Amino acid sequence: MRYVASYLLAALGGNSNPSAKDIKKILDSVGIEADDERLNKVISELNGKNIEDVIAQGVGKLASVPAGGAVAVSAAPGSAAPAAGSAPAAAEEKKDEKKEESEESDDDMGFGLFD
């Protein structure tokens, strides 16, 4: 992704055909080392293409990907509601879940992926 972003920065900055040297210069400016193999792959794929057309094609492809809405799950016919005696057990399970969540958040030092 960093190579594509650097290529786009160079192209939008007026360089219609950025070279590996141009992209390395952009990456070096923010302290990122460039992998020549990946860099050359990005350049060979994007070389000579109109950036606006590539972006439009990407947007079209992303539009066809499902965006993960909630799936409705209905209860099976004839299934009974839980008995009233199971309510304390459910509350106890929630306490256990909350305790486990707090332990998990310590693993990522408070920086969760979806926070």
Curated annotation (Swiss-Prot):
The keyword Ribosomal protein applies. The modification N6-acetyllysine is found at residue 21. Residues 91-101 have a biased composition (Basic and acidic residues). The modification N-acetylmethionine is found at residue 1. Residues 76-90 have a biased composition (Low complexity). CDD domains: Ribosomal_P2. The modification N6-succinyllysine is found at residue 21. The modification Phosphoserine is found at residues 19, 79, 86, 102, 105. GO terms for cellular component: cytoplasm; cytosolic large ribosomal subunit; synapse. InterPro entries: P1/P2_N_sf, Ribosomal_P1/P2, Ribosomal_P2. It holds the Pfam family Ribosomal_60s. Keywords: Acetylation, Phosphoprotein, Ribonucleoprotein, Ribosomal protein. GO terms for molecular function: iron ion binding; ribonucleoprotein complex binding; structural constituent of ribosome. GO terms for biological process: cellular response to cAMP; cellular response to Thyroid stimulating hormone; cytoplasmic translational elongation; positive regulation of translation. Residues 76-115 are annotated as: Disordered. Heterodimer with RPLP1 at the lateral ribosomal stalk of the large ribosomal subunit. Plays an important role in the elongation step of protein synthesis. Belongs to the eukaryotic ribosomal protein P1/P2 family. This is Large ribosomal subunit protein P2. It comes from Rattus norvegicus (Rat). The gene is Rplp2.
